[in-house]
């Protein structure tokens, strides 16, 4: 049996997973997305050329590599085909021939988007920060057992029956709860009839293929989306996404046994960011935070939304390491910290009752009341951009990485010093 690696975001998303998955994909026989939708982008830079992927696994740029979308992913057919067309236009070869979609993937259709946006508009100041792309309602349908799934595209007559029943449910909410326009079945069917001929050939028993590949000695790479602190169960609920973002979700979301998950690589930014609403104990509102945002280009690759920036939160990461079983960390954007004179690391929190904790509490209400406890370290003036050898890093940068290891309790396996695939320091290869 080959060794397999799960890559997950260990913070609130946007940690730089795409680059690392693309880099690791050189040694993989297949790359699998196992949860999430097209609500977050994975940015890859190869030879200075930028590619943003939302649904398609980040291994697709390796032109002999098979890529898979597992049943834990909610798929927008229109977004998927748009992404395929972008890759085709960029000269990536045989995308549709190498991309396989599980028949059990729930589809995101126009009524999901309509309800998602209507709900967020109705919340007023209580917005939870949804991207409005229908992700949440699609997951609701999955759990409520009314989802239209990829396999339904193969049976249009039965699909129409399911659609009529689903729209009866959705249109009541749209019209009577949110004062919004109803969605017409004919409009949804027009979308389905347009996308089905292209998507149908990609529908494959992903679970079976992955298990066969592993049995034949091929390495598999499981690619997570969002971040562990946005997990529906363990994140800062309700300011979370609608899926399980943890490493363990790779098993159910891809259709493989947990014994096939050999190494968990947690992607960790050298500082902390968060998009949208929700508690953020180490958030900075000063020039340091603004500088991190500017140097780190902290804007969402899909949404364009500005990211909130703060000091490294080791107490939050400790929770992530615990719930994911992280084997090693990849520290990204170390170069963004260049020139920060004094660096703070959050090592715990003061609680309202006067107590202290060294790990992130569960749920947003508890996190909202936390006051960060900081350790202070000297920064470094030298540039770390593009460094590929650990020994060439400034002493203070190495001390920073070492302290992160000590406080969090997990080793640093990889350090990313720039956006390009090659701008990477390897201390321990996850596939080794």
From Swiss-Prot:
It catalyses: IMP + L-aspartate + GTP = N(6)-(1,2-dicarboxyethyl)-AMP + GDP + phosphate + 2 H(+). GTP binds at residues 13-19, 41-43, 307, 333-335, 416-418. Keywords: Cytoplasm, GTP-binding, Ligase, Magnesium, Metal-binding, Nucleotide-binding, Purine biosynthesis. It is an enzyme of class 6 (ligase). It holds the Pfam family Adenylsucc_synt. The active site is at residues 14, 42. One of its GO terms (molecular function) is GTP binding. Binds 1 Mg(2+) ion per subunit. IMP binds at residues 14-17, 39-42, 131, 145, 226, 241, 305. SUPFAM superfamilies: P-loop containing nucleoside triphosphate hydrolases. Its EC number is 6.3.4.4. InterPro entries: Adenylosuccin_syn_GTP-bd, Adenylosuccin_syn_Lys_AS, Adenylosuccinate_synth_dom1, Adenylosuccinate_synth_dom2, Adenylosuccinate_synth_dom3, Adenylosuccinate_synthetase, P-loop_NTPase. Pathway: Purine metabolism; AMP biosynthesis via de novo pathway; AMP from IMP: step 1/2. Mg(2+) binds at residues 14, 41. GO terms for biological process: 'de novo' AMP biosynthetic process; IMP metabolic process. Homodimer. Belongs to the adenylosuccinate synthetase family. Plays an important role in the de novo pathway of purine nucleotide biosynthesis. Catalyzes the first committed step in the biosynthesis of AMP from IMP. NCBIfam families: PRK01117.1, purA. This is Adenylosuccinate synthetase. It comes from Neisseria meningitidis serogroup C (strain 053442). The lineage of its organism: Bacteria, Pseudomonadati, Pseudomonadota, Betaproteobacteria, Neisseriales.
């Amino acid at each position: 049996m080959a060794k397999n690696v799960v890559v997950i975001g260990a913070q609130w998303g946007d940690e730089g997973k795409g680059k690392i998955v693309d880099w690791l994909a050189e040694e993989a026989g297949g790359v699998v997305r196992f949860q999430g939708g097209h609500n977050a982008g994975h940015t890859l830079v190869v030879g200075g050329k930028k590619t943003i992927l939302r649904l398609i696994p980040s291994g697709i740029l390796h032109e002999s590599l098979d890529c898979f979308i597992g049943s834990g992913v909610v798929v927008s057919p229109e977004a998927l085909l748009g992404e395929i067309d972008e890759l085709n236009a960029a000269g990536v070869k045989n995308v549709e021939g190498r991309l396989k979609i599980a028949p059990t993937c729930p589809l995101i259709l126009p009524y999901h988007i309509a309800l998602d946006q209507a709900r967020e508009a109705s919340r007023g100041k209580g917005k939870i920060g949804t991207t409005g792309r229908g992700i949440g309602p699609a997951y609701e349908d999955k759990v409520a057992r009314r989802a239209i799934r990829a396999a339904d595209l193969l049976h249009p007559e039965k699909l129409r029956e399911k659609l009529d029943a689903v729209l009866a449910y959705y249109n009541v909410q749209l019209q009577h709860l949110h004062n919004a326009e109803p969605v017409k079945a004919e409009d949804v069917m027009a979308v389905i009839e347009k996308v089905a001929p292209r998507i149908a050939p990609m529908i494959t028993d992903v679970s079976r293929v992955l298990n066969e590949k592993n049995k034949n000695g091929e390495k598999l790479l499981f690619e997570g989306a969002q971040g562990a602190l946005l997990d529906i169960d363990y994140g800062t609920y309700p300011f979370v996404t609608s899926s399980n973002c943890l490493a363990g979700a790779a098993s159910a979301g891809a259709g493989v046994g947990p014994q096939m998950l050999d190494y968990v690589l947690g992607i960790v930014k050298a500082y902390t960011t968060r998009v949208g609403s929700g508690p953020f104990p180490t958030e900075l509102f000063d020039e340091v935070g603004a500088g991190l945002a500017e140097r780190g280009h902290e804007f969402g690759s899909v949404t364009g939304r500005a990211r909130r920036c703060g000091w490294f939160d080791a107490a939050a990461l400790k929770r992530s390491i615990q719930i994911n079983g992280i084997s090693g960390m990849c520290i990204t954007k170390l170069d963004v910290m260049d020139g920060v004179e004094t660096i703070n690391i959050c090592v715990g929190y003061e609680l309202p009752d006067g107590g202290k904790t060294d790990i992130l509490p569960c749920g947003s209400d508890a996190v909202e009341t936390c006051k960060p406890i900081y350790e202070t370290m000297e920064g470094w003036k030298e540039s770390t951009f593009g460094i590929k050898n650990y020994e060439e890093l400034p002493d203070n940068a190495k001390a920073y990485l070492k302290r992160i290891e000590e406080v969090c309790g997990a080793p640093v396996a990889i350090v990313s010093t720039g956006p390009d695939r090659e701008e990477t320091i390897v201390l321990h290869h996850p596939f080794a």
